[in-house]
């Protein structure tokens, strides 16, 4: 089980990403717009740099919803491989069967 502080930190990052998503997208569009003058684009770059670092979606980490484990997480289920295996063997995941060939 991951420390509760790490799980809370990820949740805080997720909220910051949501909060600044629209502003961030607008600034990125201004930076990429070649029709604007260099001064306007530079001002947009500086404004983008002033946003909180954790407002960047790439800083987020997928974690298991049961254990908080950061590695081996299946996006479709939101579970780490260990817990997904346990749940699948109990038959709680519809349509999932053990592979045989």
UniProtKB/Swiss-Prot annotation:
Protein's name according to its UniProt entry: Small ribosomal subunit protein uS14
Gene source species: Azoarcus sp. (strain BH72)
InterPro entries linked: Ribosomal_uS14, Ribosomal_uS14_bac/plastid, Ribosomal_uS14_CS
Classification via PROSITE patterns: RIBOSOMAL_S14
Pfam families: Ribosomal_S14
Molecular function GO labels: rRNA binding; structural constituent of ribosome
Function description: Binds 16S rRNA, required for the assembly of 30S particles and may also be responsible for determining the conformation of the 16S rRNA at the A site.
Source superkingdom: Bacteria
Gene Ontology CC: one annotated term: small ribosomal subunit
PANTHER family found in the cross-reference section: 30S RIBOSOMAL PROTEIN S14 (PTHR19836), SMALL RIBOSOMAL SUBUNIT PROTEIN US14M (PTHR19836:SF19)
Disulfide links within the chain: none
GO terms classed as biological process: translation
Family the entry assigns: Belongs to the universal ribosomal protein uS14 family.
Coiled coil regions in record: none
Quaternary structure and interacting proteins, as annotated: Part of the 30S ribosomal subunit. Contacts proteins S3 and S10.
UniProt cross-references to NCBIfam families, sorted A to Z: PRK08881.1
Presence of the UniProt keyword Aminoacyl-tRNA synthetase in the record: no
UniProt entry keywords in alphabetical sequence: Ribonucleoprotein, Ribosomal protein, RNA-binding, rRNA-binding
């Amino acid at each position: 089980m991951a420390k509760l502080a790490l799980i809370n930190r990820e949740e805080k990052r997720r909220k910051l990403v949501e909060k600044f998503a629209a502003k961030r997208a607008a600034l990125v569009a201004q930076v990429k717009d070649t029709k604007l003058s260099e001064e306007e684009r530079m001002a947009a770059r500086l404004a983008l740099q002033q946003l909180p670092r954790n407002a960047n979606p790439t800083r987020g980490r997928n974690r298991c919803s049961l254990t908080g484990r950061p590695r081996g997480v299946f996006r479709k289920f939101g579970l780490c491989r260990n817990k997904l295996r346990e749940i699948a063997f109990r038959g709680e995941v519809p349509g999932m069967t053990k592979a045989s060939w």
